[in-house]
Amino acid sequence: MAPGGGGGRRDGWPARGRLLLAALLLLLWTRAASGQSSPQQSVILGMRLASCNKSCGMNPDGIIFVSEGSTVNLRLYGHRLGEISSNLISFTEVDDAETVHNSTNCLELTKDLVVQRLVNVSRGNTSGMLVVITKFLRRSENMKLYALCTRTRADGPWLKWTDKDSLLFMVEEHGRFLPLWLHILLVLVLLVLSGIFSGLNLGLMALDPMELRIVQNCGTEKERRYARKIEPIRRKGNYLLCSLLLGNVLVNTSLTILLDNLIGSGIMAVASSTIGIVIFGEILPQALCSRHGLAVGANTIVLTKIFMLLTFPLSFPISKLLDFVLGQEIRTVYNREKLMEMLKVTEPYNDLVKEELNMIQGALELRTKTVEDIMTQLHDCFMIRSDAILDFNTMSEIMESGYTRIPVFEDEQSNIVDILYVKDLAFVDPDDCTPLKTITRFYNHPVHFVFHDTKLDAMLEEFKKGKSHLAIVQKVNNEGEGDPFYEVLGLVTLEDVIEEIIKSEILDESDTYTDNRTRKRVSMKNKRDFSAFKDADNELKVKISPQLLLAAHRFLATEVPQFSPSLMSEKILLRLLKYPDVIQELRFDEHNKHCTRHYLYTRNKPADCFILILQGKVEVEAGKENMKFETGAFSYYGTMALSLAPPDRSPAHPTPLSRSASLSYPDRNTDMTPSSLAGSNQFGSCILGQYVSDFSVRALTDLQYIKVTRQQYQNGLLASRMDNSPQLTLDGCATCTENLSERPELPVVDETTTLLNERNLLLHRASQEGTI
């Protein structure tokens, strides 16, 4: 068997290939030179380390080293290795790796390495496992170097391999550096420290600084004491984390080394350290500290501080770097949803009763719910028409409803123009049949509108400001082809918001439903019935009530410019209204509806009076097309008849008049009703100092109205001037009259044109209502 070179490293395959190629060329050259044919021989090309039962490996130079007293498996590569026996392979001792190539003769074979057998030969006879047993070195020796020797036959000469891949170091086995009892004790101590560091890492880092503050304020006395100990070092989160991790890694590494030295086998040392660290260093301590982290952390605070001090040179700079890169530690902060869910999940374990939990939940949901979620739908609201008369029937309906704030609508329920408070009716007599507008405009309560997406917390703040405890919910409707408009959806009250907070319904004697959503009705046990107190249908009211007189007085003083306090004092106006024949009644003849006495004004006939309808309905006919429409109470006509137009002013060119006679207040942007349209337009003309109406007004029902003639009005103006200037004598009446005639003229309007425009507006609105 001839040596052909070899190598024992994976990265030495190119060198071995070159050696193999050189050996084959040398073999062929030898055979060709001899000219003789010889039988094919076994060839060893290389050797490498396969395994051993003790520490072994390869040094940086590629030389195999093994421990003394171990069994080593060497992998051989070559040709026809199945024909090689153990007596053809041996080792010889050499001085050093540098001089091994000086000689190829194996002068003396060593007995320190015993070649056992060649096993596991491959099917192609190109590789096999050589088992070698190493003996112990002498006391004075700590290392020996051996070279591989082979021969071709049992009686042939030994040849020494000269490359480094065929060398083998045998080193002294290192013994334990500590006594066995101390070694075992140190392993146990390190195992305990590993568990402490692992448990503290989980227990302390799981304690949020915010949670520690909460425990300090509301925990038990023991918990407060523990929290006060832990909180200072827990604030230094990254520093504490780095110290615990460095200590844990240091202890686990030391434990592995000690176990390797104690057991001696690499696999057993790794398995033992893994089992010990996992069970006693991770599972048990973390299971304990996850439940009692506060107590464990407080009782081991001294040990933690010691390790923080010992690891300060390394852990503190790393913690500062983490603070710079990652920023400050993000503390646990519960938002609204998480806090609410935490209360629900922990309900079986906390001492909160269901009502308290509902209140907390309701308060937390204020910012997530809108007024549309809790409002009362518009069709379910109790409302009053703006043209309602506060008679006994209306008053009884209001009292039976039980509500203290009632919306007032005009034309349709979505057009809310006022709010009526029940306390406003304290001095209203049902027998007076006072118009509702008189009351609402006298108190002029603000109407509070909110959008449907307003959050409940914002709505509560608005209610707390004291503006109103009732709001109208609206939204912008931009559906369809027309312009966007505000659509009223319903009402929301302070009671609705409070009910949403406490998650319970507040029922009183006025509630009709227990809930706006379920629409479950309340049983009315104590509901009062006022039907027995209502007036008979055939009962007539001959005289005007004081309340109606007051309403007419206030209406004339505030809505009709000719009776404003700047022209006629309120005292004189009241005296004028109490003058005989100023307030009149007209009985309607059902059998002769078009009789002459039903006409208050006749087209193209002179008239010298002003008329204000108090009760009843009239029909107005105007324009070339003879358009007709109906008006009711508090519509007025003939303001131009109260004063003569100047001679130099043509009726065909009137002075423009601002529409200040509307029944709506100036600061409101509301639609006009037919009554307000009729009352806000005075139509007629002045011909030769005499007022001639170009319209007709005919009664449709029994009427009660105020009729003021021109002479009565002029006398009232004169009386007001004399009342304001009591120093004037009778001799100064002429001067007073002159001054009166020189007073600023009230502007007039083209009444027919105005009437036509208002009629078109009424027809357009009626068509819209029919479409809806």
Swiss-Prot record:
Positions of post-translational Phosphoserine modification: S658, S662, S767
Assembly information from the UniProt record: Interacts with COX11.
Location in the cell: Cell membrane
Other facts noted in the record for this chain: Shares weak sequence similarity with the cyclin family, hence its name. However, it has no cyclin-like function in vivo.
Intramembrane runs of residues: 238-258
GO cellular component, one term: protein-containing complex
Task of the protein: Probable metal transporter. The interaction with the metal ion chaperone COX11 suggests that it may play a role in sensory neuron functions. May play a role in biomineralization and retinal function.
GO molecular function: magnesium ion transmembrane transporter activity; sodium ion transmembrane transporter activity
Stretches that traverse the bilayer: 176-196, 262-282, 291-313
Membrane topology field: Multi-pass membrane protein
Lineage: Eukaryota, Metazoa, Chordata, Craniata, Vertebrata
Pfam families: CBS, CNNM, Ig_CNNM4_N
Family, as annotated: Belongs to the ACDP family.
Entries under PROSITE patterns matching the protein: CBS, CNNM
Segments in the Cytoplasmic topological domain: 197-237, 259-261, 314-772
Positions in the Extracellular compartment: 1-175, 283-290
Name of the protein this chain belongs to: Metal transporter CNNM4
UniProt entry keywords in alphabetical sequence: Biomineralization, CBS domain, Cell membrane, Glycoprotein, Ion transport, Membrane, Phosphoprotein, Repeat, Sensory transduction, Transmembrane, Transmembrane helix, Transport, Vision
Record InterPro entries: ACDP, CBS_dom, CBS_dom_sf, cNMP-bd_dom_sf, CNNM, Ion_transp-like_CBS, RmlC-like_jellyroll
Glycosylation site residues: N120
Region of interest (Disordered), ranges: 647-676
Tissue specificity statement from the Swiss-Prot or TrEMBL entry: Present in spinal cord dorsal horn neurons and in developing teeth (at protein level). In the tooth, higher expression is found in the ameloblasts during the transition and maturation phases of amelogenesis; reduced expression in the odontoblasts.
Primary location: membrane
Domain CNNM transmembrane intervals: 176-356
UniProt cross-references to Gene3D superfamilies, sorted A to Z: CBS-domain (3.10.580.10), Jelly Rolls (2.60.120.10)
Protein's GO biological process: enamel mineralization; intracellular monoatomic cation homeostasis; magnesium ion homeostasis; magnesium ion transport; visual perception
